[in-house]
Amino acid sequence: MSYIEKINTNGMGIMEKVREAHRKEYGVEPDVIAVAPGRFHLAGEHTWFFKDKTLSMAVNLPVYVSASLREDTSFKFYFVQLEDEKHTNLSSLKLKKEDKWANSIKSILYGFYSGGFELKGIDFTIYSEILPSAGFGITTAVKVASCWAIRELCGLKCSQDQILQVIERANKNFLGTANHSADSFAAIFSKENNLVLTDYAKKSCELVPFNFKEKTVLLTDALVPRIVTWNEDSLMQPENVLLLGELKERKANVSGGWQYEEDKAEVNEVLSVVSEDTKRRLLCVMNEHKCVLDCVNAIQKYDFSSFARSVNRSHQNMRDYDISCPEIDWILKRVHELDENPDDLRNPVNCGRITGKGFGRGIYTILRNSDVGKYKEKLEEYEKIFGFSPKCYSVKPANGVRLI
């Protein structure tokens, strides 16, 4: 079995498939097609509530949204790979559990409509070789590509800032979820050969050139069932934000202009008012911010060993945060063993980390090209031991959303 799956990114070939799927479902050519990239977070995705930073890579796992205007005010949705269709209209635009993936597009329609934008009836077709259940930013890509398609089709005068507000209303008011700016920023602002660094304190992002040679980036869906072992919301309380705020110190020579206090006595004194579990996890938040800063610093210096150390340290941090699981830890331990000197923690040649919501499934690894085949063998061994059949994708940094 081949574990390194090839995603069709051939522009002309896949575009015809997208158009054909839309024609077959609705009997008309699409009026517009938008494409947005998948995404994974390298570090920092669990610290957004504390207004820290997240380092992300938009990747060439494209999601296509084709759309055509209707003569009425209804909305129809079709997901090609799921062979599933849904429908709604403005008067019944509500979150429905049974609508699953279609709720993402419905939320964007709500985001526009609730912002005073006038909508027309639209037929939508979603084409993605990676399903939303895998993670990897597919759901966000559906939302963002839908934004671009709706704006174009309905002739809406809607700035980029207004688009971000549409997405925020979609997430908070329709879906009832947090609005993670790093997700949207990666899908919108990314450029080839760059990472996206989101600063939640400044509500902004910047591009970080990413050009390590002779390396392959792999995303692995370990297919471990997600089991939530604790509620992250219990940590995301205003009083904890205030505590960590006391430990933020200005620093002119670091990204964002601040870092967390490193004096252990000071840290212990400030965190002495919380339980041991809460203290441990707040320390993980602080450590994760340092991992993000160290990753960016190493990338800018073209220092892969330092970058890899920071990534590996971030995964250990996620374990302390109670996000990882034995199956993913097993895979990443095998990655470390691919080094000729696996005990030399100062100069790793490969690295990897759990990514996403955690509690199972997503891993990214950045390997020497010569180690990709060996990693495939480890995945075969993983399947024999744990009984899960992983899927693995070779990816690279991709451009953000655009109309085709």
Please report, for each region that a protein language model flagged, where it lies by residue.
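A short acidic Gly-Thr/Ser loop motif
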Residues: 130, 355-359
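Short Gly/aromatic-enriched secondary-structure transition segments
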Residues: 51-58, 236-237
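FabD-like malonyl-/acyl-CoA
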Residues: 140-141, 362-367
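Gly/Ser-rich oxyanion-binding loop with an adjacent helix/lid
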Residues: 2-34, 43-53, 92, 98-211, ...
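Gly/Ser/Thr-rich loops at beta-strand to alpha-helix junctions
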Residues: 313, 359-360
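C-terminal nucleotide
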Residues: 1-39, 64-103, 194-353, 366-404
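Short, charge-rich binding segments
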Residues: 55-58, 66-69, 116
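A structural signal for short, well-ordered beta-strand segments
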Residues: 124-126, 220-222, 363
